[in-house]
Design a protein with these regions (language model features):
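Active-site-proximal helices and loops of the catalytic beta/alpha 8
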Residues: 1-62, 114, 133-162
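Aromatic/acidic polysaccharide-binding cleft in carbohydrate-active enzymes
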Residues: 11-14, 64-96, 112-151
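Short, surface-exposed beta-strand/loop micro-motifs that present aromatic residues
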Residues: 51-54, 112-114, 182-189
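Aromatic-anchored helix/helix-loop segment that forms the rim or "lid"
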Residues: 41-44, 48-50, 84-109, 162
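Short amphipathic alpha-helical surface micro-motifs
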Residues: 3-7, 43-48, 105-107, 125-128, ...
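Short secondary-structure junctions and interdomain/linker hinges
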Residues: 54-58, 72-73, 118-122, 164-171
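Glycan-recognition and catalytic regions of carbohydrate-active enzymes
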Residues: 124-126, 130-189
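Short Gly/Pro-enriched turn/cap motifs at secondary-structure boundaries
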Residues: 103-104, 115, 176-177
């Protein structure tokens, strides 16, 4: 996206002074895949591909989103059944069970931890910090759950935001991949 080719021409969306940032969908897909049990080495290769090929000023401003208005909610992706092209009627009737949600919240906290510590900046889609779930539009765009927020998740996001604010290597530091194998993802900032 920093120097994208589309419609037969090189586009300079970010480095051409048109946009301040771009959506970092590689990050989203890699992190959610890892949280669903994906291979850590593969996930880190996806992340490293961006780190090695994007200029540092671009890396610093990549939008690290786990959910957007164009995607399923992260909690649903991590803990729910895969969408697999199912229709809107199926999506409308899906809700995580208590056990799915409990496991999903734990995995979402892991994903959010990576969202706040990988290169780029955390871009939280409204309601993710409160535990909203949902498949594709319009199910990912429900109202914010005022008074029913997952307070543990909100406190987790706040703590990570404060950590990032107080620790400059998290927003301007180097990145060292120390992932040892396919089961563990690790890096140093």
């Amino acid at each position: 996206a920093s120097n994208k080719e589309s419609y037969g021409a090189r586009r300079k969306f970010l480095l051409g002074e048109e946009l301040d940032s771009v959506m970092y969908y590689v990050f989203r897909n890699a992190i959610l895949d890892f949280c669903r049990g994906g291979d850590a080495k593969y996930v880190m290769n996806q992340i490293m591909s961006v780190i090695e090929n994007y200029p540092r000023p671009v890396l610093r401003v990549l939008m690290n989103s786990l959910s957007t208005h164009d995607t399923e909610r992260a909690l649903t992706v991590i803990a729910g059944e895969p969408l697999n092209g199912r229709d809107r009627q199926w999506q409308a009737n899906q809700k995580l069970s208590y056990d799915q949600r409990k496991r999903g919240i734990a995995l979402l906290k892991l994903a959010v931890g990576m969202q706040y510590t990988l290169p780029g900046f955390p871009c939280v889609y409204y309601g993710d910090e409160a535990g909203l779930e949902g498949y594709r539009d319009p199910f990912n765009r429900c109202c914010y759950p005022w008074g029913r927020e997952d307070k543990e998740l909100i406190e987790w996001d706040k703590a990570l935001g404060n950590l990032r604010k107080s620790c400059s290597p998290l927003w301007d530091g180097d990145f060292l991949n120390v992932t040892p194998g396919k089961n563990y993802l690790s890096y140093i900032r």
